[in-house]
């Protein structure tokens, strides 16, 4: 690591001191570029600054690992993608860490080799243990939480859906924070023709802890990736056959992140995936090769989420709810 950029340079210097990385500290991206101390950069700034910082860096010749999303809006994503296609087509790798998760990669391998037959439904859940923090700026629970789930399903299937809709609720944690967000619980549906359904469930209300689970349903069985555990030091992937089968078709255990006290809860689940993602980025930069993900992957995920948002309904919006 050659440099750390943060407007709070004191905080950046404390990080450099704790980590022992010896990086230089800069107070702005402009200062970093002027110093000419590196040629590859990871951007983890607020969404509103993603495009601005990415543009500055790629123009300066940097290759960039950009945390999702591209810009936060469908129109902005389309415009930025068109610009990158014209001027810097291989400069940006979008940070979809689930593609580098060993458990999900194994599940994808099982699916592609026909272990559970033809897959007709994929369910992906992401549940936070609490609300977004006070002062956090959210564009909505679907854009904020579901983008990784959506990309996971697109990556697993290699397809784009043709229809989407969503349902949202405000049932608990929205009252515990000053963060203004449309819903604290939502379900996004996406249809791939008439033969495949994707379901994404996101919530801020899983008070017992961080929950990440995916299930692939096939004509000959199902694959389960992960189960909730308050101490997620292992991720189990299991493939089951049809009813009546006595043994699992496949089973493999992968290490969790072991983030420890004070670490964000998602590090416990995806710590190894984040590490591998960064390794792949650096390998591609060193070799001058193409990245495994691009800005176009970010646009595709945003297109699905935007379609769901356009059809997003809550009870107050007149969603069809039958009285009992």
Predicted features and spans:
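Beta-loop-alpha module in the N-terminal Rossmann-like domain of NAD(P)-dependent dehydrogenases
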Residues: 19-83, 273
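A contiguous active-site-proximal alpha/beta segment in oxidoreductase catalytic domains
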Residues: 48, 71-134
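C-terminal helix-rich "cap/oligomerization" subdomain common to oxidoreductases
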Residues: 40-43, 78, 266-267, 280-324
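NAD(P)-binding Rossmann-fold cofactor-contacting core
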Residues: 1-18
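NAD(P)-dinucleotide binding in Rossmann-like oxidoreductases
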Residues: 178-181, 194-276, 294
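Rossmann-like dinucleotide-binding domain that binds NAD(P)(H)
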Residues: 133-209, 296
């Amino acid at each position: 690591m050659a440099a750390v950029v943060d407007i709070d340079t004191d905080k950046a210097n404390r990080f450099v001191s704790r980590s022992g990385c010896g990086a230089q500290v800069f107070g702005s991206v402009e200062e970093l570029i002027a110093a000419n101390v590196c040629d590859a950069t990871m951007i983890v700034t607020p969404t509103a600054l993603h495009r601005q910082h990415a543009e500055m860096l790629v123009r300066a010749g940097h290759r960039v690992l950009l945390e999702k999303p591209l810009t936060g809006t469908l129109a902005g994503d389309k415009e930025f993608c068109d610009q990158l296609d014209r001027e810097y087509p291989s400069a940006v790798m979008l940070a979809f860490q689930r593609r580098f998760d060993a458990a999900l990669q194994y599940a994808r391998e099982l699916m592609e080799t026909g272990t559970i037959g033809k897959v007709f439904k994929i369910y992906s859940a992401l549940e936070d243990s609490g609300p977004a923090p006070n002062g956090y700026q959210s564009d909505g629970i679907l854009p904020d939480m579901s983008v990784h789930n959506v990309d996971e399903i697109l990556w697993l299937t290699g397809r784009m859906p043709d229809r989407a809709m969503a349902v949202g609720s405000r049932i608990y944690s929205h009252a515990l924070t000053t963060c203004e967000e449309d819903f604290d619980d939502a379900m996004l549906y996406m249809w791939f023709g008439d033969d495949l359904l994707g379901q994404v469930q996101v919530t801020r209300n899983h008070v017992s802890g961080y929950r990440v689970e995916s299930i692939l349903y096939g004509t000959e069985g199902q694959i389960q990736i992960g189960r909730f555990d308050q101490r997620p030091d292992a991720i189990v992937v299991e493939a089951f056959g049809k009813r009546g089968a006595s043994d699992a078709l496949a089973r493999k255990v992968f290490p969790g992140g072991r983030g420890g006290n004070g670490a964000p809860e998602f590090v416990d689940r995806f710590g190894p995936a984040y590490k591998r993602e960064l390794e792949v980025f650096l390998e591609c930069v060193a070799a001058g090769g193409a990245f495994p993900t691009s800005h176009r992957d970010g646009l595709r995920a945003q297109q699905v989420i935007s379609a769901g948002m356009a059809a997003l309904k809550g009870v107050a919006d007149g969603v069809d709810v039958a009285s009992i």
